[in-house]
């Protein structure tokens, strides 16, 4: 994988220390090499592109967004370059959807059943906002 193949808002797999895998958002791409900033909630960290396990964007079969996270936390908040804040609230149940909202004031929630659907919404929001 190459940095030029990535976009802000991409959902990527990251290797964990115990050889597991977690999913993160790309929040910023540094221009000085093969490094991007990703996060698990509001804990951003630098990540070399060689450690990425692949972009999840076009994986239509990954349908259960509620399975992405356990539902012990109410919301997972991500802050992107330029100040775009998104909160993800997994809803586990009959429909398995996720609600996402933008901003601190008068948040607007949108429902998503498919990860792919959420990915396109995120790309569009980032493109329109900045």
Locate the predicted segments by residue.
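Acidic, low-complexity, intrinsically disordered interaction modules
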Residues: 31-50, 69-113
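Detector for Asparagine
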Residues: 18-19, 64, 96
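Short alpha-helix capping/helix-loop boundary micro-motifs
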Residues: 1-3
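Short beta-strand-centered aromatic/proline hotspots
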Residues: 11, 19-32
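Intrinsically disordered, low-complexity, charged/polar segments
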Residues: 41-68, 110-128
């Amino acid at each position: 994988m190459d940095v030029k193949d990535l976009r802000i808002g991409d959902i990527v797999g990251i290797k964990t220390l115990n050889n597991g895998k977690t999913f993160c958002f790309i929040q910023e791409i540094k221009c000085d090499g093969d490094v991007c900033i990703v996060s698990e909630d509001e804990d951003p960290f630098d990540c070399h592109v060689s450690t990425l396990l692949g972009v999840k964007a076009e994986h239509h079969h990954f349908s259960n967004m509620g399975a992405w996270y356990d539902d012990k936390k109410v919301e997972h908040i991500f802050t992107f370059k330029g100040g775009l804040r998104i909160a993800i609230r997994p809803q586990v149940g009959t429909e398995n959807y996720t609600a996402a909202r933008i901003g601190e004031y008068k948040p607007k929630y949108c429902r998503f059943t498919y990860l792919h659907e959420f990915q396109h919404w995120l790309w569009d929001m980032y493109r329109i906002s900045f």
